[in-house]
Amino acid sequence: MIGIVTEETLPQPAREEIRLETVLSALSEPLRLGMVRKLLLESPGVPRSCGWFGIDRPKSTLSHHFKLLREAGVTTQRQFGLERRSEVRVTDLEARFPGLLDLVRNWEPPAAA
């Protein structure tokens, strides 16, 4: 028998509950800002798992960052079996804070020292 993998969206704030100060706090950490930028530029509208990002950090650390982004309303996360995939809530963020995602897209990460 073949198992069926169901999709479940994890809890997140409704569009009208997304607060600018919470979004800015979530984006204030350079790693999270870079994760959101990568999703916007390289995978618009396509949910990605944490392995796709190629970040050399413990899985628990990445899970923490993804959770903060989701709870702030920046990303949505869906559970597919054992895998969680994230994507930016573009429509919701543009409706609440027009132009914010353009700033994220245009942000240039500092050069590595």
Task: Please provide the spans of the model-predicted regions.
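Amphipathic alpha-helical dimerization/coiled-coil segments
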Residues: 2-21, 37-42, 79, 89-113
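N-terminal helix-turn-helix DNA-binding core of bacterial DNA-binding proteins
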Residues: 22-58, 80-95
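Canonical helix-turn-helix DNA-binding module
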Residues: 51-74
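Short, Lys/Arg-enriched C-terminal cap helix and immediately downstream tail that follows
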Residues: 73-76, 82
